[in-house]
Amino acid sequence: MANTEFYFNVDSGYLEGLVRGFKGGILRSTDYLNLAQCETLEDLKLHLQSTDYGSFLANETRQLTVSIIDQRLKDKLMAEFHYFRNHAFEPLATFLDFITYSYMIDNIILLITGTLHQRPISELVPKCHPLGSFEQMEAVNIAQTPAELFNAIIVDTPLADFFQDCLSENDMDEMNIEIMRNKLYKSYLEAFYKFCKKLGGTTEEIMCPILEFEADRRAFVITINSFGTELNKEEREKLYPTCGRLFPEGLRMLGNADDQDQVKTTAEYYAEYKALFEGVGIGTGEKTLEDKFFEHEVKMNVLAFNNQFHFGVFYAYVKLKEQECRNIVWIAECISQRHRTKINNYIPIL
């Protein structure tokens, strides 16, 4: 056994074994078929009891709702993640911290947007993802500009380093909030990519392609979402993460795109992305581009488990569980609203 593998096992072998065991409990296609047959949320709860979720809803005395199921799913994932984080040595500890930063960004944006729409902070905080919670979160509503937000709250969080490009005295309207979200994600992805490169070895081999895809997905989505808005091409191009396969030529083409067809033309230069855009339809039951991106992400994360002695399995597990949560919540929503025609529109994992 090589020295690096030996040292990996000394510090992180136990946790890697544990995360692989947890991965074995991810729902399979037969589980989803059973869940989709359920008539009520109570039926859904019973079916989930026969899986690795076990009695995760057993202590719930309130009438079961989709939001309660969603919250309990997130709580279960958070408990598992915190166990990994509490037992991790460096550099795994920092790697796990990086995973939480994307949820912190989402939480901040959710709180700012909610405050903009006059929603009370007490109503917004429970909607935040527990993996991205931090102490100063509830004070977000006092900030009127990105600079105030940074000085009052962000400066003492790990996101401070990603915030340098976001500092402005602009008011926080919906457009500026969306620009802030994309600038934060750009800085975050580029920093995470650099960290994985520095780690080297199998972690770099597994994680860098995953983060490259995430960067490119964001570039495609930013471009498509910008059509019909006030965001000009120059501003749009500044939001693209530069650690993906599209950099530099693909990003230049996206920066000049005027419509969805030109975005698709850019994708055609990259075999992997060409296939994703080709399978997209707009009819009922046809897959959206978002679905295709999720499917590709799932595929990459499942493949991460084919190699040993790397940190990528922790990232992959969290992302697979996140997709699993989305799937269960989707099925629960369809049952709750008696809208069964779309109940099978989830993203299978295994």
From Swiss-Prot:
A Gene Ontology term for the protein's cellular component: proton-transporting V-type ATPase, V0 domain
Keywords (A to Z) from UniProt: Hydrogen ion transport, Ion transport, Transport
List the InterPro entries.
ATPase_csu/dsu_sf, ATPase_V0-cplx_csu/dsu, ATPase_V0-cplx_dsu, V-type_ATPase_csu/dsu, V-type_ATPase_csu/dsu_dom_3
Enumerate the Gene3D superfamilies for this protein. ATP synthase (C/AC39) subunit, domain 3, V-type ATP synthase subunit C domain
Entry's Gene Ontology molecular function annotations: proton-transporting ATPase activity, rotational mechanism
**Family designation:** Belongs to the V-ATPase V0D/AC39 subunit family.
Under the subunit heading, UniProt states: V-ATPase is a heteromultimeric enzyme made up of two complexes: the ATP-hydrolytic V1 complex and the proton translocation V0 complex. The V1 complex consists of three catalytic AB heterodimers that form a heterohexamer, three peripheral stalks each consisting of EG heterodimers, one central rotor including subunits D and F, and the regulatory subunits C and H. The proton translocation complex V0 consists of the proton transport subunit a, a ring of proteolipid subunits c9c'', rotary subunit d, subunits e and f, and two accessory subunits.
Q: What name does this protein carry?
A: V-type proton ATPase subunit d 2
Organism name: Xenopus tropicalis
